[in-house]
Amino acid sequence: MYLILQDNDVSRYIVEAVEEDNPEVTVIYQPAMIRMEQENLMVVKRETVEEKLGRDWDVQELHLNLISLGGNVDEDEDRLELSWVL
């Protein structure tokens, strides 16, 4: 599955958090966007993003920077999880 964000300051902190919580993630920097790919499961954790940003962060804020995503989405107030079940 994949997650594509606009390439901006907030997204860069989100990418750092995703890399910390998902060590196997592949990050691809492209013009104006950042694509993250991972097999099976990718998690964006509120707590980790808050640590990187240095402020409170609502998982719904991810949608402000989101270009596209692929996979099954499970979202609550603490995390957004993308998975791929065959």
Regions found by a protein language model. Name each.
Residues 1-4:
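Short glycine-/aliphatic-rich beta-strand segments at the starts of folded cytosolic domains
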Residues 6-11, 52-56:
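N-terminal start-of-chain detector that recognizes signal peptides
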Residues 7-21:
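Short amphipathic alpha-helix segments
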Residues 23-27:
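A short linear hydrophobic-aromatic micro-motif
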Residues 30-33, 37-86:
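Helix-rich interaction surfaces within compact, conserved domain-sized segments
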